[in-house]
């Protein structure tokens, strides 16, 4: 019986066809970054960064391999056509399976970014973990920056994005998580905003790019971005602020540096009989004092809590005002209307409903730690 079974298995193995649908890495040129730009002539500029591996000779006579970045770009009608054109310029096949970044130029992002991403979602070999960002100026220019600490510009930008995610400056967003958000009629997206530093050898995170209906419509600064993410209940490992608590006087002793130890966010959406939408947004922050040059925190504890609560509440109002000015429903108020007030949502103007939402926001601060010992 065992022999018959072995013979049967052997025959099946012999008749089983092998899979020849393979992609050999030795023939692949890995794309590390993709950029989308609009030229002054209103044409589509497609750019990529690929690794450029070279050898370094050591004094001992041995060689080590290192990698740099090579930038390629072309004018095309679509991203797929652009990739086909660039494929004719290099020996090998372009492969986006290890792509790290997708960058939009500022002018390009002012148009609808969705069509440019269509090919990425359709290609089964595309990397769904790629990060996205908007670049002030042409995105392809940022690929030509020569960073001092990292030879690969793609890895440099990726490290920067990951560190600012940890510090609650930008949200953790990938091409996969963006897919559902960008098609949601009740929510708008926000993406990191990058710029080339003044010396041309560094890249800075400027803040957040606000989108309205898949088009760039406004921005938030770095500090505003952190507060927005807390208001949106998205906190990274750290969330730090430095606030002036003495009539905006510039001296060092008038500032306090804080880190969010814990937080609680409550957002309630209500609709009255006239169909007007109101939102109560309350944020409670438990803060740790990391720097206070005046020194005596316990003595000024109540005063600091009260002053900081006023400052954060005022700044929260400014952040919400900027979101409404850009018509960017990043809080997903429309999504809550669809789910819990569907009849009211059907009557709303889907283009401008967010601008007409009445917000009541309050931030309550309590300092819970101000030294090494809690």
Region spans (language model):
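Membrane-proximal alpha-helical signals and transmembrane carboxylates
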Residues: 2-374
């Amino acid at each position: 019986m065992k022999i018959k079974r072995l013979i049967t298995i052997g025959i099946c193995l012999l008749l089983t066809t092998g899979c020849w649908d393979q992609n050999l890495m030795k023939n692949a040129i890995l794309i590390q970054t993709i950029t989308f730009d609009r030229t002054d002539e209103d044409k589509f500029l497609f750019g990529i960064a690929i690794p450029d591996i070279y050898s370094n000779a050591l004094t001992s006579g041995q060689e080590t391999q290192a990698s740099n970045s090579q930038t390629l770009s072309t004018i095309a009608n679509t991203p797929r056509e652009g990739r086909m054109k660039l494929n004719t310029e290099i020996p090998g096949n372009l492969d986006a399976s290890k792509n790290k970044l997708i960058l939009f130029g500022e002018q390009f992002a002012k148009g609808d970014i969705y069509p440019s991403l269509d090919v990425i979602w359709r290609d089964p070999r595309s990397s769904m973990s790629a990060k996205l960002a908007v670049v002030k100026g042409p995105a392809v220019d940022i690929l030509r920056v020569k960073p001092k600490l990292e030879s690969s510009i793609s890895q440099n930008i990726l490290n920067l994005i990951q560190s600012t995610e940890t510090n609650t400056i930008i949200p953790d967003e990938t091409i996969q998580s963006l897919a559902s958000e960008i098609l949601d009629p009740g929510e708008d997206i926000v993406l990191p905003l990058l710029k080339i530093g003044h010396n041309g050898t560094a890249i800075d995170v400027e803040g957040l790019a606000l989108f309205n209906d898949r088009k760039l419509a406004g921005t938030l600064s770095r500090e505003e971005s952190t507060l927005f993410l807390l208001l949106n209940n998205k906190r990274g490992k750290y969330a730090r602020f430095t606030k002036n608590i003495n009539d905006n006087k510039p001296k060092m002793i008038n500032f306090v540096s804080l880190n969010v130890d814990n937080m609680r966010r409550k957002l309630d959406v209500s609709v009255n009989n006239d169909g007007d939408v109101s939102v109560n947004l309350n944020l409670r922050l438990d803060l740790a004092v990391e720097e206070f040059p005046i020194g005596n925190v316990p003595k000024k504890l109540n005063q600091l809590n009260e002053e900081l609560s006023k400052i954060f509440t005022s700044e929260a109002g400014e952040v919400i005002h900027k979101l409404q000015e850009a018509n960017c429903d990043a809080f997903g108020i429309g999504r809550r209307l669809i789910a819990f007030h569907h009849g009211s949502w059907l009557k709303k103007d889907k283009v401008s409903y967010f601008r007409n939402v009445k917000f009541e926001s309050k931030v309550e601060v309590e300092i819970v730690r101000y030294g090494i010992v809690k």
